[in-house]
Design a protein with these regions (language model features):
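Membrane-interfacial helix-loop segments of redox and metal-homeostasis proteins
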Residues: 1-148
């Protein structure tokens, strides 16, 4: 498989993941602002997670932060510039770290699991992997930002 073909597949996978993540984050943001109970499924406690102190950062719902992150990643992926690839990878890596922290809080502080939140964390993890793989496979992207 050629490098170009692999890059196209990784880019397409990342775009699909960003769109799905955007949908999940949009739903959670909508639920937050409308004051609705999220559809959670068996064994989940979305309402407990959504109403916890960890559901906001500086007064901003983390679902809205996720929405902005997924939208930013999607735009960066659609731009097709090397600097945009660096931006997408950085946003996804920060999102991965923040999602890991929030998942830790779900498990060990809130003592509840929100399947929507876990889905978003999984999507962000896969986005971080896909965008970082593209970045590593494209050495020129690093050279553009940090010339030798």
């Amino acid at each position: 498989m050629s490098t170009d073909s692999t890059d196209r597949r990784l880019r397409l996978a990342a775009i699909v993941l960003a769109v799905v993540g955007l949908g999940v984050a949009a739903y959670l943001t909508y639920v937050h602002y409308e004051g609705l109970r999220p559809v959670c499924g068996l064994g989940g406690d979305c309402e407990k997670v959504q109403s916890s102190e960890w559901s906001k950062l500086a007064g901003v719902p983390v679902a809205l932060l996720g929405l902005l992150a997924y939208a930013s990643i999607l735009v960066a992926l659609l731009v097709r510039r090397e600097e945009a690839l660096i931006a997408a990878a950085l946003i996804a890596l920060v999102g991965f770290g923040f999602s890991a922290y929030l998942t830790y809080r779900e498990l060990f502080t809130i003592d509840a699991i929100c399947p929507w939140c876990v889905a978003s964390a999984t999507i962000m993890t896969l986005l971080a992997l896909a965008t970082t793989a593209r970045l590593v496979r494209t050495p020129r992207a690093i050279e553009v930002r940090y010339p030798t």
